[in-house]
């Protein structure tokens, strides 16, 4: 029996992008302008072993009776009536709006299973918006990036909870198991190579490709655009983005260079692993730290490549000193891989490509629930949270909200009272316990509802 899911939400939250992702074709027009979708559109979707009909709807919005907006809403209401379940989509980067809250009530009144989808949830702003959506009372949000295909395995798990059991025994699926117009299981790892101008980014890519595909020059700023190339390295596919060097914004005067920096930032956001290239002769300058901080804030896995190693006499003691400096200067990505390379000579390139694949695997890591609970109990017992104003803070339990990067929610009695230092302790403890070097780890505190609070209020 066919199962139908309607994708609903306010205009311009990415409903059509998600629809195209699920059906594997660009059947729905996508544009940044709200209201591009006017009619409901149906397609056959497949996610892992789940087959279903999906309906793309116009954005839910109010309009005068008889107007085009009102007719669009009528089409949406018809789709909801025909559906067996709803996917309520909101823009996690923008956060919840009054319209989102209004139509969350609308979705509840439909009296059908609802899967809450936090689209555009990549990056720190997206994560905050996704967590904010718990206030809607529609259950746990599923963080996805419909544009980049992230979070599809989490969406699969959520849809399995509202759909009839598949006829065959279900398997576990990764994000790559969604069927697209091309076999996404072959999708390359997206890698951005960033750094200060003239660090040797293009030289490294030319070595990997075996040809002088990108212009190189001792003059800083030869690369103006973010350039994408595909690469197969020992049987694994990669898409590599070479970027213009990042300088301090205050020193940028040419309009062209301003655009280059913006392009570099976009490439870093689009990537899954970011390689920060540093010149071995000028390492860990202020701008390197700024770039690394940007990468961490965007939630990307980080690998440091120390280039022009051959010019430094290949001193092994220098790498040890770099590791110490990196852990001190960048504690938020402690243990990140540091690889000495010579892009010109090809030295260390095998180690770099292995480090990229390892970082990608860690970035995608999901921690088994039993092991997560065991770590949490040990960490809190070893170092309980400090009392605040004479009141003890109680940490109840922890759950993993998502991967890419690994993100966790700790439920506690008073979220606003837990010191930042204790949060850092939990992050470092978790990183060490589960061996998660070099990837951002997000731990968000959320207060556990007190079932007796309303009773106390009534007595007073």
Curated annotation (Swiss-Prot):
Q: Which domain of life is it from?
A: Bacteria
* Annotated KH-like domain residues: 365-449
Keywords, in A-Z order: GTP-binding, Nucleotide-binding, Repeat, Ribosome biogenesis
Q: Which part of the chain is the EngA-type G domain?
A: 3-167, 189-364
Q: Which PROSITE patterns match?
A: G_ENGA (PS51712)
Give yes or no: UniProt keyword GTP-binding. yes
Q: Spell out the family assignment given in the record's similarity comment.
A: Belongs to the TRAFAC class TrmE-Era-EngA-EngB-Septin-like GTPase superfamily. EngA (Der) GTPase family.
Subunit structure comment from the entry: Associates with the 50S ribosomal subunit.
**What is the protein name stated in its UniProt record?**
GTPase Der
Organism of this sequence = Nitrobacter hamburgensis (strain DSM 10229 / NCIMB 13809 / X14)
């Amino acid at each position: 029996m066919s199962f139908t899911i309607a994708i609903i939400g306010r205009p311009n939250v990415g409903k059509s992008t998600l629809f195209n992702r699920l059906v594997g074709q660009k059947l729905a027009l996508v544009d940044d302008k709200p209201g591009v979708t006017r009619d409901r559109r149906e397609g056959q979707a497949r996610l892992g072993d789940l087959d279903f009909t999906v309906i793309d709807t116009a954005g839910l919005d109010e309009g005068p009776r008889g107007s085009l907006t009102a007719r669009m809403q009528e089409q949406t209401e018809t789709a909801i009536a025909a559906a067996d379940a709803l996917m309520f989509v909101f823009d996690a980067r923008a956060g919840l709006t009054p319209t989102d809250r209004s139509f969350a009530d609308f979705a509840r009144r439909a009296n059908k299973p609802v899967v809450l989808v936090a689209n555009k949830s990549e990056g720190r702003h997206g994560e905050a918006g996704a967590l904010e959506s718990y206030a809607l009372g529609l259950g746990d949000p599923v963080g996805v990036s419909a544009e980049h295909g992230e979070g599809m395995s989490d969406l699969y798990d959520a849809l399995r909870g509202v759909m009839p059991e598949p006829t065959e025994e279900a398997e576990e699926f990764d994000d790559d198991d969604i069927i697209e117009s091309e076999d996404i299981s072959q999708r390359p790892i997206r890698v951005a190579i960033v750094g200060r101008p003239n660090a040797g980014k293009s030289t490294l890519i030319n070595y990997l490709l075996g040809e002088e595909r990108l212009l190189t020059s001792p003059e800083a700023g030869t690369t103006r655009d973010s350039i994408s190339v595909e690469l197969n390295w020992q049987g694994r596919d990669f898409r590599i983005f070479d970027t213009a060097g990042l300088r301090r914004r205050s020193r940028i005067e040419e309009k062209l260079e301003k655009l280059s920096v913006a392009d570099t930032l976009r490439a870093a956001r689009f990537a899954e692993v970011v390689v920060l290239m540093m010149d071995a002769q000028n390492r860990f300058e202020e701008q390197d730290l700024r770039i690394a901080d940007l990468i961490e804030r965007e939630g990307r896995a980080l690998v440091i490549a120390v280039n022009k190693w051959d010019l430094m006499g290949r001193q092994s003691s220098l790498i040890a000193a770099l590791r110490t400096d990196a852990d001190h200067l960048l504690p938020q990505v402690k243990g990140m891989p540091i690889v000495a390379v010579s892009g010109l000579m090809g030295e260390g390139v095998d180690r770099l490509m292995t480090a990229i694949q390892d970082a990608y695997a860690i970035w995608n890591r999901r921690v088994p629930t039993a092991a997560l609970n065991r770590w949490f109990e040990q960490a809190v017992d070893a170092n309980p949270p400090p009392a605040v104003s004479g009141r003890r803070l109680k940490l109840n339990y922890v759950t993993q909200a998502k991967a890419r990067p690994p993100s966790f929610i700790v439920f506690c009695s008073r979220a606003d009272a837990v010191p930042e230092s204790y949060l850092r302790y939990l992050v470092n403890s978790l990183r060490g316990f589960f061996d998660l070097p070099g990837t951002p780890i997000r731990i968000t505190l959320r207060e556990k509802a007190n079932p007796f609070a309303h009773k106390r209020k009534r007595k007073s």
